[in-house]
């Protein structure tokens, strides 16, 4: 476990920035870089500004602005409220989707539903799809997903493939492990 934790430390923003600065010093020691930071790149950009401000010409942040002085718990509380607001807006726009979501939840409680990879589909995984409602076009994407969920009384195989593809931790497992570390300060 200790070796694994040490290895994961290489994926933290400070480690990434130190690697990037080594590359910059090697390739263009006399030319500062310009950065564009989005999501985790925003956190890396802010870390770069903290550690090597003289190595940067300019930094553009489009997302991933660190909540300085705020804990991960505070960020999550604000995020939960935003997701709840987005869910209310989604169901107000697509009222029929609530009945489909309820039907899906009931179906998942009564049946052992498996995704194509063999993983069990749970109500909680289905609820996780609501986290994407902040993205552009997400309302329509989620509605179309729900709309195609059933063929008669059975779940549509195409629906199951789409849900599987939307499970971020299946394809990005390191995100789940490292996510909260981005909120550490000091």
What role is predicted for each listed range?
Residues 1-118:
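Gly/Pro-rich cap/lid or specificity-loop segments adjacent to the active site
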């Amino acid at each position: 476990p200790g070796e694994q934790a040490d290895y994961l430390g290489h994926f933290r923003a400070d480690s990434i920035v130190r690697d990037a600065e080594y590359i910059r010093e090697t390739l263009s020691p006399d030319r500062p870089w310009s950065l564009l930071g989005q999501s985790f790149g925003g956190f890396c950009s802010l870390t770069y500004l903290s550690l090597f401000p003289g190595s940067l010409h300019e930094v553009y942040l489009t997302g991933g602005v660190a909540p300085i002085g705020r804990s991960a718990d505070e960020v999550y509380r604000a995020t939960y409220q935003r997701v709840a607001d987005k869910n209310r807006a989604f169901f107000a726009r697509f009222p029929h989707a609530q009945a489909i979501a309820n039907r899906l939840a009931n179906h998942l409680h009564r049946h052992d539903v498996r995704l194509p990879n063999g993983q069990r589909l749970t109500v909680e995984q289905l609820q996780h799809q609501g986290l994407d409602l902040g993205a552009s076009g997400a309302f329509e994407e989620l509605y179309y997903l729900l709309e195609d969920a059933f063929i008669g009384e059975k779940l549509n195989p195409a629906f199951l493939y789409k849900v599987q593809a939307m499970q971020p931790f299946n394809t990005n497992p390191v995100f789940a492990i490292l996510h909260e570390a981005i909120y550490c300060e000091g």
